[in-house]
Amino acid sequence: MTRMNIVRCRRRHKILENLEEENLGPSCSSTTSTTAATEALGTTTEDMRLKQQRSSSRATEHDIVDGNHHDDEHITMRRLRLVKNSRTRRRTTPDSSMDCYEENPPSQKTSINYSWISKKSSMTSLMLLLLFAFVQPCASIVEKRCGPIDIRNRPWDIKPQWSKLGDPNEKDLAGQRMVNCTVVEGSLTISFVLKHKTKAQEEMHRSLQPRYSQDEFITFPHLREITGTLLVFETEGLVDLRKIFPNLRVIGGRSLIQHYALIIYRNPDLEIGLDKLSVIRNGGVRIIDNRKLCYTKTIDWKHLITSSINDVVVDNAAEYAVTETGLMCPRGACEEDKGESKCHYLEEKNQEQGVERVQSCWSNTTCQKSCAYDRLLPTKEIGPGCDANGDRCHDQCVGGCERVNDATACHACKNVYHKGKCIEKCDAHLYLLLQRRCVTREQCLQLNPVLSNKTVPIKATAGLCSDKCPDGYQINPDDHRECRKCVGKCEIVCEINHVIDTFPKAQAIRLCNIIDGNLTIEIRGKQDSGMASELKDIFANIHTITGYLLVRQSSPFISLNMFRNLRRIEAKSLFRNLYAITVFENPNLKKLFDSTTDLTLDRGTVSIANNKMLCFKYIKQLMSKLNIPLDPIDQSEGTNGEKAICEDMAINVSITAVNADSVFFSWPSFNITDIDQRKFLGYELFFKEVPRIDENMTIEEDRSACVDSWQSVFKQYYETSNGEPTPDIFMDIGPRERIRPNTLYAYYVATQMVLHAGAKNGVSKIGFVRTSYYTPDPPTLALAQVDSDAIHITWEAPLQPNGDLTHYTIMWRENEVSPYEEAEKFCTDASTPANRQHTKDPKETIVADKPVDIPSSRTVAPTLLTMMGHEDQQKTCAATPGCCSCSAIEESSEQNKKKRPDPMSAIESSAFENKLLDEVLMPRDTMRVRRSIEDANRVSEELEKAENLGKAPKTLGGKKPLIHISKKKPSSSSTTSTPAPTIASMYALTRKPTTVPGTRIRLYEIYEPLPGSWAINVSALALDNSYVIRNLKHYTLYAISLSACQNMTVPGASCSISHRAGALKRTKHITDIDKVLNETIEWRFMNNSQQVNVTWDPPTEVNGGIFGYVVKLKSKVDGSIVMTRCVGAKRGYSTRNQGVLFQNLADGRYFVSVTATSVHGAGPEAESSDPIVVMTPGFFTVEIILGMLLVFLILMSIAGCIIYYYIQVRYGKKVKALSDFMQLNPEYCVDNKYNADDWELRQDDVVLGQQCGEGSFGKVYLGTGNNVVSLMGDRFGPCAIKINVDDPASTENLNYLMEANIMKNFKTNFIVKLYGVISTVQPAMVVMEMMDLGNLRDYLRSKREDEVFNETDCNFFDIIPRDKFHEWAAQICDGMAYLESLKFCHRDLAARNCMINRDETVKIGDFGMARDLFYHDYYKPSGKRMMPVRWMSPESLKDGKFDSKSDVWSFGVVLYEMVTLGAQPYIGLSNDEVLNYIGMARKVIKKPECCENYWYKVMKMCWRYSPRDRPTFLQLVHLLAAEASPEFRDLSFVLTDNQMILDDSEALDLDDIDDTDMNDQVVEVAPDVENVEVQSDSERRNTDSIPLKQFKTIPPINATTSHSTISIDETPMKAKQREGSLDEEYALMNHSGGPSDAEVRTYAGDGDYVERDVRENDVPTRRNTGASTSSYTGGGPYCLTNRGGSNERGAGFGEAVRLTDGVGSGHLNDDDYVEKEISSMDTRRSTGASSSSYGVPQTNWSGNRGATYYTSKAQQAATAAAAAAAALQQQQNGGRGDRLTQLPGTGHLQSTRGGQDGDYIETEPKNYRNNGSPSRNGNSRDIFNGRSAFGENEHLIEDNEHHPLV
């Protein structure tokens, strides 16, 4: 092995060791392929090298923003993680999901055979084998969890948490610089990372203590999910969150700060950059006061938030700091997105263009990615997300995935995580921890959670692992580590006496029913935050408050409907000693309690005030319901409903004209006919500048007693000369009001009048208008960085844009001489390359623009200087008593830049900051939100003022407004429409802007206004006002100019006057760019070897232009220059076609160098890669070499023939044997198509008859062969023809023909013979042996209808002789033994697939699912096919493994079908329950009724759970052959030619089979009621039916006896025993009556797979059809035979009699019965009445719902009297009459409570009409307005006057 290979191997080995030390994930103990491992190592090594290069590059160019670095680093990190996961292993956590050995234990490692390694093999092969044995990435995404993380004070300092999960295996993260968590279970906080505490300390230590840098912060490269809150607060030096959390996908929000899940607050240097974040599952977003943080409002936060708690509070603080920091947040596209499919887009309203689509950006280079599956339409619920290609992830994913359709590749789980996979819910034996993952009970109880620095007991109850109890449970007072189930409904009492001012506090009382104390709610937030909908559920459980209810300042509340269950306020304490309910200062409250709420107050009154949207009529409704008189002080009509539209008179205002500095309004005059006209003063027009159109703006916004943001103009009312009012009113605002161009104004009109009786006010809605454009000021041009092919220019926006600046026009042109002039004199003596100097540039200049004066005829908006000059004129204030001194103008210019703060916003911000500091300094609990919340009874001064009800300040209409002057420069326009300049010299521009890759600039079309010059329109959305002119020539002088233009689609728009800013600038040169590429230098000999022509390609990019080239010919020996040629790059000269010529060269070795000279100077020297060899030709010519190659090829051909002959001699026989085997096993050579062979028949060989059957995979027809002989020599006439019903090209059709292929290999007596295949027609036909009697299952079921058969007598062998039964079982076993000998697995052995011919011989058929097992012990199918679940073994159900032993299991099920005459296996169970019954519970079918122990032992042998414990078919044939006929022995495959003899050790012994549950129970003389075991109501099963054989109908006793009455046979019956096992719980599986009447099994095509039609008279009805006498009238004799009951002691109820002769079964909702329509004469199907109750006129019925018909009242009375006498005899049984328990086996349970029936529940109270109704099932037809339905909760007998005994 070479030294280089050794070095490479050692290097790879070192990489693996390093990866193992980093401990990123577990390893798997299986091998991987050579290619995969090599690629993984190669990729890792290459990525590490690239990463080092990038790091070195960033060290030198750290000031350049690299937008692609993050993606490259992420890809590298992901590849490293894959290799690390495949090599390393971490320790086991309580959740075993971290261990990859869960499914591949270490003891089962794949062994490697090294015997083939020869001694000559190098060490490389051995190392590769060892490498492949250990490198195997896990199939699932491994989860590594961390608890809550708090980084504080220093970037690397992780503080210990007070609140922990208490995981004993939790790892301490202190001191780590890189945390490898994938999930943080809790919140992650970065706070107070400040180098200096105060500004004085910062100034003092600025030079000694620089701020922290980005590289010092801890990184989380693998973190995908934070289950709590992400908080970044007061952190310096942190520039980009992308570098800290490069893969963060999901923020859970299970614990919130206030109601926010993402908080970024007061961070001076931060950029968000969380471009992978796709889901915020709960909570809102608050991002404020971050001075340099841009793009906060470009993200669609509402799209990320999936819950109704979606309050978003973000600002763009960088815009307010523009004059201080010089930073302006850019607008526009951040990534190129053709077709708008890659990025997400926001829709913003624009007055001129309507709705505008704006690209959502995280930064200037990264947009918010779009995924069609983040939300599921049309519900908009959370979706699974997308993978990297945009495809839909698995439904259990959230936030995206690595691979589609793979629940193990999710970034986060939608529901629950368990063992590396996302699942819907935990299994029954597991417990849900933290609402996200499953743990075992032992793992749960190991946890010791710490809440508030105190350990609390953990509990594992009802599938929940938590410190609190689940719903319906409460803490056990005797043991606080346990929960106990509540008796009835849990009543949770919460002792609170604090303010509910945050959403987490509200969540803490979600389960509370009784509030012990005062409930004060003060939740601030946006109305559209969705909190109101969440609070609706939070307060829904409260029904009692012991104190008072106070709702104040809660903006999310629209109504108080969330207290829908509030019934009582005890008011033990009163608010202000007066009020039990207080509601005030709720700005959005529109309604009070729901009209259905039945609320009572024990004492106190109600106070409702200052709710501006609450109409007074709702207050009156509430007071009327509470029976409390209205009080004008407590329920003030004047302070409620001020902003609501309760009663109003609207004024419709129209705009008649709009100019740049004026707006004209008009409206109809106000109707004053019904008021005192002398009191009407006039109209006042209010207006103010607004940033945007806000449909929700109100008149009261931005107003106080001192400062009013609205300006106003008053117009006095005058009557006309005739005394009539003016029909229309006209007003305008103009230069005197300092109206500015292109400014949006809000306005409204209000009337002014003196208060008097009957006065009415008029007010208009708020409208919006934007003034017109005016010529903008010119921009100011500045120069920035210059590069070799680009010039970065910057400029300042016009001081007065006077319109929406849509774009800037940038023009540039070359100002350079042609290089061809210099090329003419390049090779002259005076211009040698050595003496050439660099070209000198003309002086670079900047042309200053002159300010443009606005014509004096127009009044413009005042500038800052003019406003300061008129300061004295502004010092005025409204004459309002108590008004504060006006300070709006006295404030400094810096303060004037900021908007006057809203008092309520200040209160909300203060509350948020207090809560934030509490959370940071006192971290909350991880397990849950604390129920004991700290007292928050603070009341601010603002709230104290608000609580002074009836003293709300009012604004006088005559007050003069103050004008707030903004001293900021106007911001650029946000318009994105394409301009069309009006300057004649400019060309038309394109309509749709594009985006420059890697920049923030949105561009329009580049055009060339003049020859040699270019221009481009740059969108004004680029708020940094800069542009990089790219694709410039290197080292070239350019002239640049700039102008600003407005939106040309708007009338009056224009560009700035032609005084454009200008500059001259030369681009930089590029070192070595003038070099000729070495590989392009070529040479060739000319006429002889002494003449060489050298050619090359010129440089593609040069520094300004090429003047010429210098070509040198050097000696290869000493490097001396032999010849030099100089050539100028003149016009028409070609270096490739012409080049230079060297002549008269001597023999030797030379190389060529070429030097290009550009405008900048001589470039580097380029040398040819191939040397020039000049020599005289020798012996080895081309002809000689070709002849030698020909001889070599001949010798190689001879050697190949020898090798071929040797292989044929040595290995020919083995290849032949393998070929023969593959012919016998065609499935090894399946090529997905059927090939016709000798079995092929012609279509006219058979005649197709009528259809005789249909199965899951096709139809069967009768056929007749036309004297045809099959390939096996069978001449056949009648035959069966199978035809597939699917598409001929489908996969099922191929499987159908493959079945025929399989049958070609079989030739035995007990397998259906194949006669041939007709594949030339569509659909194809398979011709088989005719089996006249059909399949075994249907044949057995047909025997049930035989009159000889009586199930109650167990006369099974009277129907099928015992020897015939043995014969059939032996024939099936012999056929399966034949398949077993051929290594074939049938996979679908069932009675339906066993066919019977006319001499009652059973043969095995239907090989559609058969598979070959020659090389494997079992067969595991792939794809999706129908499977016979009820005939499958446990290993087949769970693992999909099939072999001969699984067929043995199916044979046991076939025996069950035989002894039950074709009964459905596992009757009463669904397919999922069958899987649980067999695979999980490991149970088998209980012994059928009338089944002999011998056969049940054989069944149990076949149903052994372990496959190796089951017998083989060979053993079963020898066992059954002892009782079989001699004919069978003559035809048996096992007992004839093959002589497959068993050893003594292989013989079966039935005595070893357990006899449990096989012996018949002892029959008692009479049923004993006391022996019937009593069950609790919760343990009863309503599906417990009675076997049919226990009933026998007898003829009527006399003419008056009800035909519905049934009695017990004279034979004493066995008392039903209490079922105690899972087998006996499924009682329907124990009877031999066959399948239920309507068993629903939906799976595939026939009765065993899908729902089928059923026959009548099959199984008994449901047990609860009977009713006792005392169940209805308290022990009286009435209701003798209602609901199918009997009036005879000892007689049962109509359990076995069908409802109306098969019309309906009387069963509800269970799979055992089918609901069918019944005739109008029938009562409801659940009555269970006998068939004789119907079919007679509907007259003189004694009772409803199936009562027996009586011909007269006397007959009914006589029968009732007899029943009453029988009832008296039952008094010792608790007063019960004809009880259901008189019949053992009915499932009725006696009640321990005296006088009550255990089968029924009292639902009706006692009233004047009856004594109550314990029946739960309804009443007569006349209930429910005469409809035919019966009432579920009504009385059984309603009409008392018709009672015969009343």
UniProtKB/Swiss-Prot annotation:
It is an enzyme of class 2 (transferase). It is found in: Membrane. Residues 1726-1742 have a biased composition (Polar residues). Residues 775-869, 969-1067, 1077-1179 form the Fibronectin type-III domain. Changing residue 547 to S: In m596; increases the number of muscle membrane extensions during larval development. ATP binds at residues 1252-1260, 1282. Residues 944-980, 1718-1742, 1769-1826 are annotated as: Disordered. Residues 961-970 have a biased composition (Basic residues). Its cofactor is Mg(2+). Coiled coil: none annotated. Autophosphorylation activates the kinase activity. Interaction with shc-1 may inhibit its activity. Glycans are attached at residues 113, 180, 364, 453, 518, 652, 671, 696, 1017, 1047, 1078, 1087, 1093. Changing residue 1434 to L: In e1391; dauer formation above 20 degrees Celsius and increased lifespan. Increases the number of muscle membrane extensions during larval development. Residues 971-980, 1808-1821 have a biased composition (Low complexity). One of its GO terms (molecular function) is PTB domain binding. Its EC number is 2.7.10.1. InterPro entries: FN3_dom, FN3_sf, Furin-like_Cys-rich_dom, Growth_fac_rcpt_cys_sf, Ig-like_fold, Kinase-like_dom_sf, Prot_kinase_dom, Rcpt_L-dom. GO terms for biological process: cell adhesion; cellular response to salt; dauer exit; dauer larval development; defense response to Gram-negative bacterium; determination of adult lifespan; glucose homeostasis; heat acclimation. It comes from the Eukaryota. Changing residue 1374 to N: In sa219; dauer formation above 20 degrees Celsius. Normal NaCl avoidance behavior after exposure to NaCl under starvation conditions. Changing residue 401 to Y: Dauer formation. Disulfide bonds join 371-386, 393-401, 397-410, 413-422, 426-438, 469-483, 486-490, 615-646. Tetramer of 2 alpha and 2 beta chains linked by disulfide bonds. The alpha chains contribute to the formation of the ligand-binding domain, while the beta chains carry the kinase domain. Interacts (via cytoplasmic domain) with shc-1 (PID domain). Interacts (via kinase domain) with daf-18 (via C-terminus). Belongs to the protein kinase superfamily. Tyr protein kinase family. Insulin receptor subfamily. This is Insulin-like receptor. It comes from Caenorhabditis elegans. The lineage of its organism: Eukaryota, Metazoa, Ecdysozoa, Nematoda, Chromadorea. The gene is daf-2.
